[in-house]
């Protein structure tokens, strides 16, 4: 998987057409009303639903006030620069309530749980689970067969563009509510304890804990048993 360069992301955000999409439930004498070039209308008789940009739909509503009896607007963003990722073709399990922005790469058989937030440029490897309410900041990169625990934060780096992103290598387990700061690499097979704040690189096959996190031991058989990644949870 290719990590997006920070300057690519900055350019994308700068040049994107900012969007305020809305869904409008509307009723009245709607025949012949032009809701704008961005709009998609699903109207039967004197009622229906219109999808499109608020600027266009608002102008149509104001110009046809005498024809419109009532309307309700659903809106969840304003001048948004980055759309959400189209999930329909992703070969992964993605649960309701996950927020995943465009230009995120998700490997096959990954699992994204409810409430996870994944920012532009992040990369998630095959078979990796992102648990509930975890946050992957911009350009955060997670390898294969990892588990990022509930509420964990992998800090993002888009600004400044020279900053090094968080890198989580393969087979890593990050405990609940742990925080991995910018520029940190967590080595292959390592375990980060719940609640740890990691401010420096973690060697492969070690366990770190505490604030700030420190190596407390090498991975042993007991640790492997307690932190086993279950492939059964990743089957589609």
UniProtKB/Swiss-Prot annotation:
Keywords: Acyltransferase, Amino-acid biosynthesis, Diaminopimelate biosynthesis, Lysine biosynthesis, Repeat, Transferase. It comes from the Bacteria. It catalyses: (S)-2,3,4,5-tetrahydrodipicolinate + acetyl-CoA + H2O = L-2-acetamido-6-oxoheptanedioate + CoA. GO terms for biological process: diaminopimelate biosynthetic process; lysine biosynthetic process via diaminopimelate. It holds the Pfam family Hexapep. Catalyzes the transfer of an acetyl group from acetyl-CoA to tetrahydrodipicolinate. This is 2,3,4,5-tetrahydropyridine-2,6-dicarboxylate N-acetyltransferase. It comes from Geobacillus thermodenitrificans (strain NG80-2).
């Amino acid at each position: 998987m290719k990590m997006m360069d920070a300057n690519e992301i900055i350019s994308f955000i700068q040049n994107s057409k900012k969007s305020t999409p809305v869904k409008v439930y509307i009723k009245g004498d709607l025949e012949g009303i032009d809701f704008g070039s961005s709009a998609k209308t699903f109207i039967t008789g004197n009622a229906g639903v219109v999808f499109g940009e608020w600027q266009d739909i608002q102008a149509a509503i104001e110009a046809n006030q005498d024809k419109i009896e009532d309307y309700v607007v659903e809106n969840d963003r304003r001048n948004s620069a980055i759309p959400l990722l189209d999930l329909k073709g992703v070969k992964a399990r993605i649960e309701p309530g996950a927020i995943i922005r465009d230009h995120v790469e998700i490997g096959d058989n990954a699992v994204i749980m409810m409430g996870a937030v994944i920012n532009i440029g992040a990369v998630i490897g095959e078979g990796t689970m992102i648990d509930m309410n975890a946050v992957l900041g911009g350009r955060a990169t997670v390898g294969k067969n990892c588990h990022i625990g509930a509420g964990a934060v992998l800090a993002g780096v888009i600004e400044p563009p020279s900053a090094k992103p968080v890198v989580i290598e393969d087979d890593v387990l990050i405990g609940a509510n742990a925080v991995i700061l910018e520029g940190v690499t967590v080595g292959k097979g390592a375990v980060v304890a719940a609640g740890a704040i990691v401010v420096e690189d973690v060697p492969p096959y070690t366990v770190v804990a505490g604030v700030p996190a420190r190596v407390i031991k090498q991975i042993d058989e007991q640790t492997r048993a307690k932190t086993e990644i279950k492939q059964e949870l990743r089957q589609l």
